[in-house]
Curated annotation (Swiss-Prot):
Binds 1 Mg(2+) ion per subunit. Catalyzes the specific phosphorylation of the 3-hydroxyl group of shikimic acid using ATP as a cosubstrate. SUPFAM superfamilies: P-loop containing nucleoside triphosphate hydrolases. This is Shikimate kinase. GO terms for biological process: amino acid biosynthetic process; aromatic amino acid family biosynthetic process; chorismate biosynthetic process. PANTHER family: SHIKIMATE KINASE, SHIKIMATE KINASE 1, CHLOROPLASTIC. Keywords: Amino-acid biosynthesis, Aromatic amino acid biosynthesis, ATP-binding, Cytoplasm, Kinase, Magnesium, Metal-binding, Nucleotide-binding, Transferase. InterPro entries: P-loop_NTPase, Shikimate/glucono_kinase, Shikimate_kinase/TSH1, Shikimate_kinase_CS. Its cofactor is Mg(2+). It is found in: Cytoplasm. PROSITE patterns: SHIKIMATE_KINASE (PS01128). It catalyses: shikimate + ATP = 3-phosphoshikimate + ADP + H(+). ATP binds at G22, T23, G24, K25, S26, S27, R128.
Length: 179
């Protein structure tokens, strides 16, 4: 598979990756940005940098509503950028304002995976505050179902189950080239 940089169509201002935690947004985002010659922006990393503490710490100290407000500020900030691949947090699309800003900012690509695949990918991670006490398939399935209507709003959806990062990036770049 070719690993060279490709040119995104001029109509593509940004590429926004949405999806549940563990669907590959960060891994795909970094490689996609490299391939497109775009910058990579991770919303959660921007929040951590701005607050000076981890997302787990933000949740513990201030709760989810405070985190979501910070997330909306980060979405506002990146929505003004150009030539970025943006990885959102899994819950960023819950907010109607965020969804609107993201759609206006670029091509929204939703990454999906089966509940089993997400559980496998998240098994060893400890930085997921909404799953801190419950990493069961039932909890993950319920959260995915709650968010499905928001994820379905994307321009392109890709199931990452059983696929390599390179394969997912190739699907996205193929879509962008044909757009």
């Amino acid at each position: 598979m070719a690993t060279s940089t490709i040119s995104a169509p001029s109509s593509v201002r940004n590429v926004i990756l949405t999806g549940f935690m563990g669907t590959g947004k960060s891994s795909v985002g970094r490689l996609l940005a490299h391939r497109l010659g775009f910058r990579y922006c991770d919303l959660d990393a921007l929040i951590v940098e701005g607050e000076g503490v981890s997302i787990n710490e933000i949740f513990a100290r201030h709760g989810e509503p405070h985190f979501r407000a910070l997330e909306t500020e980060a979405v506002r900030s990146v929505s003004r950028e150009e030539r970025c691949v943006v990885s959102t947090g899994g819950g960023a699309v819950i907010s109607p304002e965020n969804r609107c800003l993201l759609r206006k900012a670029g091509v929204v690509v939703n990454l999906t995976a089966t509940v089993e695949e997400v559980c496998r990918r998240l098994r060893e991670e400890t930085d997921r505050p909404l799953l801190k006490d419950d990493r069961s398939g039932e909890r993950i399935a319920a959260m995915m179902a709650e968010r499905e209507q928001f994820y379905a709003d994307a321009e392109l959806r890709i199931d990452t189950t059983g696929k390599s990062v390179e394969d997912v990036v190739a699907e996205i770049t193929g879509y962008l080239e044909g757009r």
